[in-house]
Amino acid sequence: MANTREFSLDKTRNIGIMAHIDAGKTTTTERILYYTGKIHKIGETHDGASQMDWMAQEQERGITITSAATTAQWKNHRINIIDTPGHVDFTVEVERSLRVLDGAIAVLDAQSGVEPQTETVWRQASTYNVPRIVFVNKMDKIGADFKYSVSTIHDRLQANAHAIQLPIGAEDNFEGVIDLIEMKADLYDEDQLGTEWDTVDVPDEYKEEAQAARDDLIEALADIDDGIMEKYLGGEEISKEEIKAAIRKGTLALEFFPVLAGSAFKNKGVQMLMDAVVDYLPSPLDVKPYKATDPETEEEVDLIAGDDKPFAALAFKVATDPFVGRLTFIRVYQGTLESGSYVLNATKDKRERVGRLLQMHSNQRKEIPEVFSGDIAAAIGLKNTTTGDSLTSIEHPYHLESMEFPDPVIQVAVEPKTKADQDKMNVALQKLSEEDPTFKAETNPETGETLIAGMGELHLDIIVDRMRREFNVEATVGAPQVSYRETFTKSTQVQGKFVHQSGGKGQYGDVWVEFTPNEEGKGFEFEDAIVGGVVPREYIPSVEQGLKEAMANGVLAGYPLVDVKAKLYDGSYHDVDSSEAAFKIAASLALRNAVKTAGPVILEPIMKVDIVAPEDYLGDVMGHVTARRGNIEGMEERGNAQEVHAYVPLAEMFGYATTLRSATQGRGTFTMTFDHYEKVPKSVQEDIIKKNGGTPAK
């Protein structure tokens, strides 16, 4: 028997909550869940009791690491919420959730306005064309300034953002908000945990300011809406419904960003934020159709939301749940799926059976019989599915656009404290790397050492912490190491010849290869330019494989050789003695011989670092950046502080948090994201080679 849909598509909202760390994102989500009746006790993040931060380390650290997906109901709408982390080490979680959202709430701290990480997530949201509303949170905080916060959206994000509310008071006197569309004030009763408020006329002392702000709002809407423009120029009255319709239209087109005010912690303004989600953010029917490829015809197809179409969904996260095991979070773009049925993992071309379907509320779960178009849910039983895979009906395989994840930039060696833990550690690392595509674990075949790599120190700290808590593996962690790379800077032509005679069948392989530098990020490209069969066809894949294997270990200090083109253009063979193995070795010898003439260099990851510190400490901060081989790109004022933008090698950033804390008496903060790879200075290169026991290029 078919199940019925609880909420129609136009009454469904898939939203994310995004912000800089500590802007109050998790608390805002908490309050939304409280007022929509999902939780009966408010959890405070700073007490480590938040409902959304469900991993033990999240509760301890008071930051959100994994995007918990939850569902809530408000005014006959279903709202699926994904709480995303604001810490830069976890931007992949943000990117991953933005892929499956239709709209987002950007939370700002009313004292700081737009902060560095806000800019990062805002850019990511723009990449995925996600409409946004802005919530200026923490209006109760000392130094809260609504006007300043709105101005930072214009200045730092170049976004057409306008207030649709004004706060009544600020700091300790923050009492509620003025609705500029209705021209009414909502005043909260402190004792009722935000569940009750009075809607009254705008207080006299705010009337002039509110009218001016409303006029500004209408003027801004006239710029993007012809209907409003005509009435505005003709001096006609514009109805509340027309204003709301224009805001919705502008928001969906990413031409307008409504701004609201409130304090999630003090339980003020959250219900109005929910109203704005329903009024202004898109349903799955309002967004551009999601693109997919038909693997048979290679043609692009649009996935249009609707239950009557073939099933197509994206697996956007894999998590291990202590009670039910492996959970695969999916976003359904079209069609429906019943628990117990089969789907095709179109990415891996494997059939999978969906055991059970769950709707998640943070880390609690409710079993559901079926998911519908537009839903976000978790599936149990998908053994081969990893993040970014396409799940479709067996008859209609589609490849949905896959996700791209950055390579890790930092690695540490981990060793189990006891031999008995080795197997447990291997299982733990395998499960954790399935969950997180930016985390990699590998064993060095020569030393037997296990290396784990990720996006930053905090990222790896949390992985080690999770091994201990979830898998009972105690591990010793080495000092962080940088993921260097090697590349060639010059073109060269070299021979690689391997001849081995020792009685019986010999070995013979002979190749001539031209190596040239490739564009950054293009990786290794192999070209077969053999004419006249001087190297027989069957040995050519072995030459490519031999080069790949040799490049994995580099030529200078054992780091992977990247961004190189290799053209096999000549060689010779022996009728009896040639073999695949001989040509593989010949190729690796060619690479080794290229070292003398190809100008090999070591590349290091360069981080984009944004440092915010009070003006008095600016000299010290800039001095530290320069001392760490950093380049200062520019500075800008941020309230009473200065923000320094710089590019600094990752190798020089270890321990910087402590340095900055002591230099600014705890008042400086910084964020750091990977930007690009760059050649290391000669002296540094020599040190790296020496440390790794490599061979300097002559």
UniProtKB/Swiss-Prot annotation:
GTP binds at residues 19-26, 83-87, 137-140. Keywords: Cytoplasm, Elongation factor, GTP-binding, Nucleotide-binding, Protein biosynthesis. GO terms for biological process: ribosome disassembly. It is found in: Cytoplasm. GO terms for molecular function: GTP binding; GTPase activity; translation elongation factor activity. It comes from the Bacteria. Residues 10-285 form the tr-type G domain. GO terms for cellular component: cytoplasm. PANTHER family: RIBOSOME-RELEASING FACTOR 2, MITOCHONDRIAL, TRANSLATION ELONGATION FACTOR G-RELATED. Belongs to the TRAFAC class translation factor GTPase superfamily. Classic translation factor GTPase family. EF-G/EF-2 subfamily. Catalyzes the GTP-dependent ribosomal translocation step during translation elongation. During this step, the ribosome changes from the pre-translocational (PRE) to the post-translocational (POST) state as the newly formed A-site-bound peptidyl-tRNA and P-site-bound deacylated tRNA move to the P and E sites, respectively. Catalyzes the coordinated movement of the two tRNA molecules, the mRNA and conformational changes in the ribosome. This is Elongation factor G.
